[in-house]
Swiss-Prot record:
Official protein name in the record: Insulin receptor substrate 1-A
Motif (YXXM motif 4): 381-384
Domain IRS-type PTB: 1-56
Gene designation per UniProt: irs1-a
Intervals of motif YXXM motif 5: 409-412
Placement of sequence motif YXXM motif 3: 364-367
GO molecular function, one term: SH2 domain binding
Organism field: Xenopus laevis
Length: 885
């Protein structure tokens, strides 16, 4: 095919072909790995062009220098991109005039070496200095000034106009003036083209000179600058006339973007078409003009008329990068390459207007979570709406909700879901099957209220959907208000407080701290669906009902950023959230009665505490001031005893055998082990060995101000429990935390999973003076730090909570800590930073618990808004604690 010119720009090389080409006249730009490859391609093609140059020579000659006097204005028409100019292979011409010198391989090599540097300008320049010297008079030599100016201008512009195309610079010539052309004034070539290529060598000038000055070809060699040499200078053909008339290539143009339109028709039409308007006449003359450009030595570069070629104008502006969708092609095809828009947006608008009717894609992907591209048209973009893809387990086919207001703003009402539409997005996250996870919208609250529902209660809203999919629970699905981006706000779930306890779990993670749901979304996450969620028995709290006043802020979920997806660790107990920033104060009308235990026993693995008052899992040290002195009626059967029956009686601390905090009903899956502050010496003899031994925190007032955590020694009464109850309770007890009911939970985290050793993560009690241990001061997590269990604690068992505030102690199920075996570590004395106060309103209500026996003063029936903690220990307890220490 007829290659008019070739060139390269950076990692693109291009070939301009004539009308004879199969594709019709146009340029082919090809991207290659790097500029070196592009240059090589350019040169290779150039050599081939040289070989063929003879046939073109006449044409290029036709433009001889005589034309110079009448510079033929050759628009850059070809240079749509100015890059073409390099490609403009004035090769034909050059070959003919300069063929010897230009052709010389050396020249070529030099040219290439300088190619990036070498500028067509040099061709311009070539005429410049040296040429003027030899040929000063000759029309061919452009005035030095012109060449220089051109050169400067050229340097400024990366691509020479297509005009250059005709000239094929002879690389060699440029490099060495003498080499450049026999004629060449070597000096001229050297001096030639002040253009960037100058440094190269005036290769061109000499070359052009070598040709008859009149011969445009010579100059065209300069033009050849299109070859790898620097486009800017080369941008214009050296030919004076071409320089004069050729619109100087604009440097800016190099920066222009190539239209990358997909459609081939586009491509063909596009470049030409887009530039056509400006170069219309040129197109007709395309080939001819190309050849015609000759340097008119007369013209000074300044005179060069810059006529904006279409390419230039379009190039100046950004070419639209519209992806042409087949649908839009037609519209794009016509408009896409219209160069008139200075900003791509304009083009876009234009195209969009045309195509919008059928193709609404505006090229922008809606990022709003709820809003998915509405278009059923080609879904080029993946909807980022979380509901469409994120929920791993259950992907509800994303429903394109038009929750966008007329202005295109997505409604952020959280209630519906993260997405504006309040459809079963919640379901998806909450797992429709497991309605429990999803939280019912708070009564009276429309799921899609305009205002975001900040209450975290929405079931595992924050937790990733998988977390939500715990287990199916028979519970009405509640829409989850999942704003994943939003930190959990506390939705107060109102629990029906049968006991009248005010405590509301503010925990965002679960709609309720229902016994079923693990204490928090996090716990649920970690716990996965371990526990078959059974409806709670004897739970005073009905999930549907919620107290208006949240009395409790649970850190558990809040500590965890709702935004972070949680990975379910089904087997592992979730680490307690590191932050114990909030004090969990629970105002319980009554201490939950041990009677709840039976229900607890029923669940093989209880993830959540049943205690009606305290369905919420408390992560903070739960200080039940009451001393459980109830007689140990807690028998093996007690697990099955009716709730009203006191499940556990606390034996005197001396015996320690039966003193265990009553299990609060169903296995409470409190994440943290509650530590009994009371003198109550929890003897979990009744508790199956699997049950964690209760740790009682004994405050040795004499010894230190810090709460001392010692695990109560369990008397060997344990056998008293019937094996059946053991089996049933064992698992439940594993999951349930000891002393969940009353004991202060010191963030001790007990692994609920039966297969793992339950772990108690203990946060050390801060000293009463209020000195707050810095988290860094945490006690070491070595097993020895707190000897919680008589059984060996493997190093792996002891895990340090991420927050350094917690000590994780793994209690092996079935191991019962003996009080003597447990010695409070110094650290533990300093331990608890956060205290969860359960003010039992009515300890007396517990049959088995004699509040009077406990040295602890219990708040009067009226809940005091402020909790006073009195660490009263019976003297026997105190002495006992001291002795233990």
């Amino acid at each position: 095919m007829n290659i008019r010119r070739c060139g390269h720009s950076e990692n693109f090389f291009f070939i301009e072909v004539g009308r004879s080409a199969v594709t019709g006249a146009g340029e082919f730009w090809m991207q290659v790995d790097d500029s070196v490859v592009a240059q090589n391609m350019h040169e290779t093609i150039l050599e081939a062009m040289k070989a063929l140059s003879d046939e073109f020579r006449p044409r290029s000659k036709s433009q001889s220098s005589s034309n110079c006097s009448n510079p033929i204005s050759v628009p850059l028409r070809r240079h749509h991109l100015n890059h073409p100019p390099p490609s403009q292979v004035g090769l034909n011409r050059r070959a003919r005039t300069e063929s010897a010198t230009a052709t010389s391989p050396a020249g070529g090599a030099a040219k290439h070496g300088s190619s990036s540097f070498r500028v067509r300008a040099s061709s311009d320049g070539e005429g410049t200095m040296s040429r003027p010297a030899s040929m000063e008079g000759s029309p061919v030599s452009p005035s030095a000034s012109r060449t220089q100016s051109h050169r400067h201008r050229g340097s400024s512009r990366l691509h020479p106009p297509l005009n250059h195309s005709r000239s094929i610079p002879m690389p060699a010539t440029r490099c060495s003036p003498s080499a450049t052309s026999p004629v060449s004034l070597s000096s001229s070539s050297t001096s030639g083209h002040g253009s960037t290529s100058d440094c190269m060598c005036p290769r061109r000038s000499s070359a052009s000179i070598s040709g008859s000055p009149s011969d445009g070809g010579f100059i065209s060699s300069d033009e050849y600058g299109s070859s790898p040499c620097d486009f800017r200078s080369s941008f214009r053909s050296v030919t004076p006339d071409s320089m004069g008339h050729t619109p100087p290539a604009r440097e800016e143009e190099l920066n222009n973007y190539i239209c990358m339109g997909k459609s081939s028709s586009h491509l063909q039409r596009g470049p030409q078409q887009r530039y056509q308007p400006s170069r219309g006449e040129e197109l007709t003359d395309f080939d001819k003009v190309f050849r015609k450009r000759t340097h008119s030595s007369g013209t000074s570069p300044p005179t060069v008329s810059h006529q904006k070629t279409p390419s230039q104008s379009s190039i100046e502006e950004y070419t639209e990068m519209m992806p042409t969708h087949p649908v839009r092609l037609t519209s794009f095809r016509h408009s896409a390459f219209v160069p008139t828009y200075s900003y791509p947006e304009e083009c876009l608008d234009l195209h969009l207007e045309g195509s919008r009717a059928n193709h609404k894609d505006d090229g922008y992907m809606p990022m709003s979570p709820g809003v998915a591209p509405v278009s059923t048209k080609t879904n080029d973009y993946m909807p980022m709406s979380p509901k469409s893809v994120s929920a791993p387990q259950q992907i509800i086919n994303p429903r394109w909700h038009s929750a966008v207001d007329s202005n295109g703003y997505m409604m952020m009402s959280p209630s519906g879901s993260c997405s504006p539409d309040n459809t079963n997005y919640s379901k998806i996250w909450t797992n429709g099957t497991n309605p429990k996870l999803s939280i019912d919208s708070i009564e009276g609250k429309l799921p899609c209220s305009d205002y975001i529902n900040m209450s975290p209660a929405s079931g595992s809203t924050t937790s990733t959907p998988p977390d939500s999919y715990l287990n199916s629970v028979e519970e009405s699905t509640k829409p989850v208000y999942s704003y994943f981006s939003l930190p959990r706000s506390f939705k107060h779930v109102h629990r029906k407080s049968e006991d009248g306890n005010l405590r509301i779990s503010a925990n965002s993670g679960h709609n309720l701290y229902t016994e079923d749901s693990s204490s928090s979304s996090t716990s649920s996450d970690s716990l996965g669906g371990q526990d078959p969620q059974q409806p709670r028995k004897g739970e005073g709290c009905i999930q549907g009902k919620r107290l208006t006043r949240p009395t409790r802020l649970s850190l558990e979920n809040s500590s965890k950023a709702s935004t972070l997806p949680r990975v379910r660790e089904p087997a592992l107990p979730p680490e307690p959230k590191s932050p114990g920033e909030y004090v969990n104060i629970e105002f319980n009308d009554k201490v939950f009665s041990g009677g709840l235990v039976p229900s607890m026993c029923s669940l093989p693995f209880v993830q959540s505490r049943v205690v009606p008052q305290r369905e919420n899992l408390s992560e903070y040290m739960n200080m039940d001031l009451g001393v459980w002195r109830a007689k140990t009626s807690y028998a093996s059967t007690s697990s099955y005893e009716p709730p009203n029956k006191p499940v556990n009686s606390v034996c005197p601390t001396e015996t320690c055998s039966s003193s265990r905090p009553p299990i609060r009903g169903k296995p409470i899956s409190r994440d943290y082990m509650s530590m009994q502050l009371g003198s109550l010496c929890p003897d979990y003899s009744q508790v199956p060995p699997t049950r964690l031994s209760a740790k009682s925190i004994t405050l040795s007032s004499s010894k230190s101000n810090y709460a001392e955590m010692s695990s109560g020694r369990v008397s060997d009464n344990i056998p008293a429990i019937a094996p059946a109850s053991n089996s049933s309770l064992s698992e439940a007890s594993r999951s349930s935390l000891l002393g969940q009911g009353s004991g202060p939970s010191a963030f001790t985290r007990v692994s609920l999973s039966p297969n793992r050793n339950p772990s108690a993560k203990v946060i050390r009690a801060g000293d009463p003076q209020g000195r707050r241990r810095h988290s860094s001061e945490t006690f070491s997590s070595t097993p020895t730090t707190a000897r919680v269990t008589t059984g060996p604690v493997s190093g792996e068992d002891v895990k340090r909570h991420s927050s350094a505030s917690f000590e994780n102690v793994w209690l092996r199920p079935g191991e019962i800590a003996r009080r003597d075996s447990l010695q409070p570590s110094d650290h533990t004395h300093n331990g608890l930073n956060y205290i969860d106060l359960d003010l039992a309103k009515d300890l007396s209500s517990l049959d088995h618990c004699n509040s009077h026996q406990s040295g602890v003063s219990h708040p009067s029936d009226d809940l005091s808004p402020y909790a006073s903690i009195t660490f009263h220990k019976l003297e026997e307890h105190r002495s006992q604690a001291e002795t233990e220490e």
